[in-house]
Amino acid sequence: MSAVLIAVLALLALCLLGGAILGFAAVRFRVEGDPIAEQINALLPQTQCGQCGYPGCKPYAEAIAGGDKINKCPPGGEATIQALADLLDVEPEPLDAEGGEKPQMVAYIREAECIGCTKCIQACPVDAIVGAARQMHTVIISECTGCDLCVEPCPVDCIDMIEVGSNLQSWKWNRPLAPGQLIATDREQAA
């Protein structure tokens, strides 16, 4: 055998061995799903409300990972947009004008009018409505995300969306800035 043939066979054997190792590694260390979509989904509010135009938060997260805009989530508001912008290293955009940031709302069931059909319970994506068939239903306010998916299926129209009032738990306190954190124009206004 000539030296060239031995070299070609040796290279062929090395290539086959390397291919087998890479094939094994591809199967053994395969990543399930899209990791960036999972990180995006973790930042979304999980209301599954559909106000973004997608049927839930996970499809919207996959769309963002595929290049869709990050400003279509009204329940998440500006805080979610900023967190998504930081994660994806893009410029934050104002909330989409079509959705718009609205005051926080919760569902309120007028219990005297409720017929107990359970359609609102089935429509609620976060199980914030409790009740039994042919019994009145009520909303667990701390669980309600204000997505208003329960309003439309109600056959007697006894569900209203009301604005959450400010209390000590929901009121946003403005933190005063320390003098070292103020920029020159802020110092002039503070004086």
From Swiss-Prot:
Record-given protein name = Ion-translocating oxidoreductase complex subunit B
What does this protein do, in the record's words?
Answer: Part of a membrane-bound complex that couples electron transfer with translocation of ions across the membrane.
Instruction: Give the EC class as a word.
Output: translocase
Cellular compartments per GO CC? plasma membrane
Record: residues binding [4Fe-4S] cluster 1: C49, C52, C57, C73
**Iron as a keyword?**
yes
As cofactor, the record names:
[4Fe-4S] cluster
User: Residue limits of the 4Fe-4S ferredoxin-type domain?
Assistant: 105-134, 135-164
Co-factor note (free text) = Binds 3 [4Fe-4S] clusters.
Stated EC number for the protein is 7.-.-.-
Which BP terms from GO are recorded? electron transport chain
SUBUNIT field: The complex is composed of six subunits: RnfA, RnfB, RnfC, RnfD, RnfE and RnfG.
Gene Ontology MF terms in the entry: 4 iron, 4 sulfur cluster binding; electron transfer activity; metal ion binding
Keyword tags? 4Fe-4S, Cell inner membrane, Cell membrane, Electron transport, Iron, Iron-sulfur, Membrane, Metal-binding, Repeat, Translocase, Transport
Give the organism's phylogenetic lineage: Bacteria, Pseudomonadati, Pseudomonadota, Gammaproteobacteria, Pseudomonadales
Residues forming the 4Fe-4S domain are 32-90
Q: Which family does it belong to?
A: Belongs to the 4Fe4S bacterial-type ferredoxin family. RnfB subfamily.
Q: Gene behind this chain?
A: rnfB
Which source organism does the UniProt entry give? Stutzerimonas stutzeri (strain A1501) (Pseudomonas stutzeri)
Q: Does the keyword rRNA processing apply?
A: no
Query: According to the UniProt record, where is the region Hydrophobic?
Result: 1-26
The residues listed in the UniProt record as binding [4Fe-4S] cluster 3, with positions renumbered to this chain, are: C124, C144, C147, C150
Q: Which residues bind [4Fe-4S] cluster 2?
A: C114, C117, C120, C154
Q: Where does it reside? A: Cell inner membrane
